[in-house]
Amino acid sequence: MDYSQFFNSALDRLHTERRYRVFADLERMAGRFPHAIWHSPKGKRDVVIWCSNDYLGMGQHPKVVGAMVETATRVGTGAGGTRNIAGTHHPLVQLEAELADLHGKEAALLFTSGYVSNQTGIATIAKLIPNCLILSDELNHNSMIEGIRQSGCERQVFRHNDLADLEALLKAAGANRPKLIACESLYSMDGDVAPLAKICDLAEKYNAMTYVDEVHAVGMYGPRGGGIAERDGVMHRIDILEGTLAKAFGCLGGYIAANGQIIDAVRSYAPGFIFTTALPPAICSAATAAIKHLKTSSWERERHQDRAARVKAILNAAGLPVMSSDTHIVPLFIGDAEKCKQASDLLLEEHGIYIQPINYPTVAKGSERLRITPSPYHDDGLIDQLAEALLQVWDRLGLPLKQKSLAAE
């Protein structure tokens, strides 16, 4: 039997549907973010990254880089084992304490990625609650969906950010059935925010637990970077907060923060935590440095919001189809998978601008887009270059513009 035919067939389907993904070979340069070297088929080229999740540029911050180098030099590279077998090193313990403090919780638990923290965290927590009903927002991330699926618990999906729909499901479940509401605080493809205070109201009214993914908000919102929950004053009302070290903090890893009993139970039962090597000491020290810095420095957050607002204003003024967003995410609607890929290719190859196309299954078919993520280091000149390049690409591909604004805000 020719087993390769099955894989070729699967890949052919992706090509036919115009959603086969090609990775750009990039080399970031510390001190020059958002500039990078693109190792293209035709050789090296200088490009500007407009889609990085290193939202605040902390991956190049001297404190963060310095902490990583110092720790690696002092203690070596790897963790040396799982958490249970020689892998619970001191920088990791310090990082978990820093995260617990960030979110005002008794404890925190680290995982190898934000995907794993959601997948393993939700699955383990829900499994430990007899007859648990999980109420999940329809736009939750794949990692949350997989965690819910692996829990084996009953799941009901409520319409995105629809409080009436959520309340109807809570009411139908009854006061005595255990319930877990799972949602994100900031949805990364549309840039909209969950009404966390009102979700907490419903959870308290109907005796439900809450699990909130703050992956795209930690570091960037709240007076100390605790996320949307901190900004909205509801951290203490949310049972489990989940986040990542790989975006605003510029490092690697995921975590959950909660009361001591929940964290201890997940630590003791979660396969995705127990049976894997711990995060390296240098990564943990770097993440701790990033968190400590952002707890006291507001420059990065303020500059980030300023840059995002300017990008939206300039692109809207140019008549480009900027989708509505209340946050730092700037989605640019295209609505066609092939043209979305073509737009991305033209921006990179002809303008030295890297924006990865966002196609199905990340977003629904017909809602394909370019997802732009400004950083504090995208200056006015780069923003103007972006707008001009996008207009040229839109014209080249025959993509529609909307009516231009009179001026940038």
UniProtKB/Swiss-Prot annotation:
It comes from the Bacteria. InterPro entries: 4pyrrol_synth_NH2levulA_synth (IPR010961), Aminotrans_II_pyridoxalP_BS (IPR001917), Aminotransferase_I/II_large (IPR004839), AON_synthase_class-II (IPR050087), PyrdxlP-dep_Trfase (IPR015424), PyrdxlP-dep_Trfase_major (IPR015421), PyrdxlP-dep_Trfase_small (IPR015422). The active site is at K247. The keyword Transferase applies. One of its GO terms (biological process) is protoporphyrinogen IX biosynthetic process. One of its GO terms (molecular function) is 5-aminolevulinate synthase activity. Its EC number is 2.3.1.37. Keywords: Acyltransferase, Heme biosynthesis, Pyridoxal phosphate, Transferase. The keyword Transmembrane does not apply. SUPFAM superfamilies: PLP-dependent transferases (SSF53383). Pyridoxal 5'-phosphate binds at S188, H216, T244, T276, T277. The modification N6-(pyridoxal phosphate)lysine is found at K247. Pfam families: Aminotran_1_2. Substrate binds at R21, S136, T362. Pathway: Porphyrin-containing compound metabolism; protoporphyrin-IX biosynthesis; 5-aminolevulinate from glycine: step 1/1. Homodimer. Belongs to the class-II pyridoxal-phosphate-dependent aminotransferase family. This is 5-aminolevulinate synthase. It comes from Bradyrhizobium diazoefficiens (strain JCM 10833 / BCRC 13528 / IAM 13628 / NBRC 14792 / USDA 110).
